[in-house]
A protein has these predicted regions:
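Structural beta-alpha unit
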Residues: 72-106
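Small/aliphatic-rich secondary-structure junction motif
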Residues: 2-50, 77
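Active-site-adjacent beta-strand anchor residues
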Residues: 6, 84, 109
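General small-molecule cofactor/ligand-binding pocket signal
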Residues: 34-36, 82-86, 137
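Phosphate- and divalent-cation-binding pockets in alpha/beta enzyme and binding domains
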Residues: 15, 93, 115
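A short acidic, glycine-rich active-site loop
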Residues: 53-65
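Absolute protein N-terminus
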Residues: 1-2, 140
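Gly/Ser-rich helix-loop-strand patches that form or flank binding pockets
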Residues: 96-140
Length: 140
């Protein structure tokens, strides 16, 4: 089984990591865990002021910051993984990565956003569920 775990470094994403470790049957000998972190692009003005290379460097620094505790946690628990970093619309990048990597399951944390917030904005998790062609497991 190939699993794509989306992380943003939040405590909700950590709960998804905890879930993987607590359910070792998901990660059998042939399983592959891909961990993705998606960042929204810096506004165009920032790219023009600081330069495209510097903007990419800032994205890389942020990705390393997010992945560091994830890597430590997975290695401590002897979980094999591969990290993916993307820049773009979060939902699209997660769904595209699932398709391009031929994953069987997307795993992500969520949180109890209030009814008004859901109605006005929706959540990344809800939109991934709506747009994904593979099952999505949300961990609360």
């Amino acid at each position: 089984m190939k699993i794509l775990l989306a992380t943003d470094g939040s405590k909700y994403a950590q709960k998804a990591l905890d879930f993987i470790v607590m359910h070792p049957k998901l990660l059998d000998v042939q399983a592959e865990l891909l961990v993705i972190h998606v960042q929204i692009p810096l506004p165009t003005g920032f790219n023009l002021i600081m330069g495209f290379d510097r903007a990419l460097e800032l994205h890389d620094i942020e990705a390393k910051k997010i992945f560091a505790p994830v890597k430590k946690f997975l290695e401590k628990n002897a979980v094999k993984y591969r990290c993916l970093s993307a820049i773009g619309p979060i939902v699209k990048e997660i769904v595209d990565a699932a398709k391009n990597e031929h994953v069987h399951l997307i795993l992500m944390g969520t949180h109890g956003r209030d009814l008004v917030g859901r109605a006005l904005m929706g959540s990344v998790a809800q939109r991934v569920v709506a747009n994904s062609t593979v099952p999505v497991l949300l961990v609360k």
